[in-house]
Amino acid sequence: MKLFATIGVLLVALLAFFVQPAQAEPDAEITHKVYFDIKQGEESLGKIVMGLYGDVVPKTVENFRALCTGETGKGYKGSKFHRVIKNFMIQGGDFTRGDGTGGESIYGRKFPDENFQLKHTKPYKLSMANAGRDTNGSQFFITTVVTSWLDGKHVVFGEVLEGQDIVDAIENAPTGARSNPKVDITIADAGEIPVEKSETKEAEPAKEDAKEPKEDVKKKGKSDKDEL
């Protein structure tokens, strides 16, 4: 009888250990808004408006914001989305080489991972591309599905507020062997938009039925020189 009681206690303890509540994400308020005007070849696709979480990752947000305005003499205007993978993400921000091997931050060529408090929990999240730990520069990506395997590896710092259809259009653009769009997709203009006080709460998920892509999609188009 004592043996069964002991086994029961152990089972309860194990269950309590494995069924612990997940640590909740901090409330992410939108502190800054920025935009991209997008062109595909000579055709205007429209505007993407993004909200940034400056209270959670202020250094990462300031880097992206300043590169949108170009106030430091360098920035995203004129650069292109060099890597597009359907059911995964769209990647840009390499304004020095344009192929995923360049880019630089406002702090120098690279800067450390600020924190990983925010997760890739839904489509249209804005996150830093990198080539490994503490190698953030200017390259970024926008998710088009849930990408939870990137949690703890890439710094989430914002989300798309308007222009999700533009992101979808970029995601579905024809691509070459290295996942680069066959027709250049460029950031024709970029800048900052004033934030109203009523806009400081994180936006609702844009796609309720989003699913994670299959494992083979996660590595498609990846090379040793690519940042993600």
Curated annotation (Swiss-Prot):
Principal subcellular localization: endoplasmic reticulum
Catalytic activity: [protein]-peptidylproline (omega=180) = [protein]-peptidylproline (omega=0)
Record's subcellular location: Endoplasmic reticulum lumen
Description of how activity is regulated: Inhibited by cyclosporin A (CsA).
Cellular component terms per the entry's GO annotation: cytoplasm; endoplasmic reticulum; endoplasmic reticulum lumen
Glycosylated residue positions: N136
Chain span(s) of sequence motif Prevents secretion from ER: 225-228
Pfam family, one: Pro_isomerase
Signal peptide start and end residues: 1-24
Comp. bias (Basic and acidic residues): 194-228
GO molecular function, one term: cyclosporin A binding
Function: PPIases accelerate the folding of proteins. It catalyzes the cis-trans isomerization of proline imidic peptide bonds in oligopeptides.
Assigned protein family: Belongs to the cyclophilin-type PPIase family. PPIase B subfamily.
The protein's name: Peptidyl-prolyl cis-trans isomerase B
Organism: Yarrowia lipolytica (strain CLIB 122 / E 150) (Yeast)
